[in-house]
């Protein structure tokens, strides 16, 4: 289980996370929604230990990432996979080497075993036979799939997704959402997804949490969020400019 308890983070006078509390259920997908620039990516960086909170705890299976040193963080990150917003592939490496990268960095597996794992992970995202291609030869959707294959390389029990459908057309976005949903169901991983794509959020989430003014103001099942009476959440979900959220 992942739990953020009373987490604060400020940059100068701007408080981005304001005594935030959030529990992410084990083996489920939680999608975090909220306005652009509202702190969702900052929250995600805390979940993987790339940022330390000014106050509060970031608990992963009861261990506080905020109190870990670099060696401890490196060890616990082996249980994480992350799909970055732009897939973050190494342009100088072919697809196979991109997927193999965490295996070479964090394990002592033999070359043949790594090759087999790479092909297995690529097949699991529908990309068999592309190991020798370069990232520049791939479409945006294919790059996202390769990024997911790399995120799965170490069989993580926690997978983080940063805007996984940004920049994709609606058909490809739906395909990526389906892949995320199926991957979670197959692996049983705990997934945290940062997203503006409300249609995708309602499709893949077990729970949806809304971040607003530095706090999680609502969390519930897709149906609970869709039918909420909270005026802030309702305005955001309905995509209306008029309401308590000021649009400037």
Task: Tell what function each PLM region has.
Residues 134-138, 142:
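Conserved ABC ATPase signature
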Residues 48:
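Helix-to-loop junction immediately C-terminal to a conserved catalytic motif
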Residues 63-64, 111-129:
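Conserved ABC ATPase "signature" region
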Residues 159-162:
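Catalytic Walker B motif of ABC-type/P-loop ATPase nucleotide-binding domains
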Residues 153-157:
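A short, proline-enriched helix->beta-strand linker immediately N-terminal to the Walker B motif
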């Amino acid at each position: 289980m992942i739990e953020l308890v009373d987490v604060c983070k400020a940059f100068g006078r701007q408080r981005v996370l304001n005594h935030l509390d959030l529990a992410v259920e084990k083996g489920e997908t939680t999608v975090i929604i909220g306005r652009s620039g509202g702190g969702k990516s900052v929250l995600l960086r805390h979940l993987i230990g790339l940022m330390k909170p000014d106050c509060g705890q970031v608990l992963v299976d009861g261990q506080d990432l905020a109190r870990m040193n670099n060696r401890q963080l490196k060890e616990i990150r082996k249980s994480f996979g992350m799909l970055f917003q732009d897939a973050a592939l190494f342009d100088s490496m072919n697809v196979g080497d991109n997927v193999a990268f965490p295996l070479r960095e964090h394990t002592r597996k033999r070359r043949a075993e790594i090759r087999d794992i790479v092909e297995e992970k690529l097949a699991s995202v529908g990309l068999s036979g592309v190991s020798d291609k370069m990232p520049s030869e791939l479409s945006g959707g294919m790059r996202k799939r390769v990024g997911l294959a790399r995120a799965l390389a170490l069989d993580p029990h926690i997978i983080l997704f940063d805007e996984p459908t940004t920049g994709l057309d609606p058909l490809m976005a739906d395909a990526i959402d389906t892949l995320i949903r199926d991957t979670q169901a197959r692996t049983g991983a705990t997934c945290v997804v940062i997203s503006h794509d409300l249609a995708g959020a309602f499709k893949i989430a077990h729970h949806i949490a809304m971040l607003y003014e530095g706090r999680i103001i609502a969390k519930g099942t897709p149906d609970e969020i869709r039918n909420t009476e909270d005026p802030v959440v309702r305005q955001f979900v309905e995509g209306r400019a008029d309401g308590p959220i000021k649009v400037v």
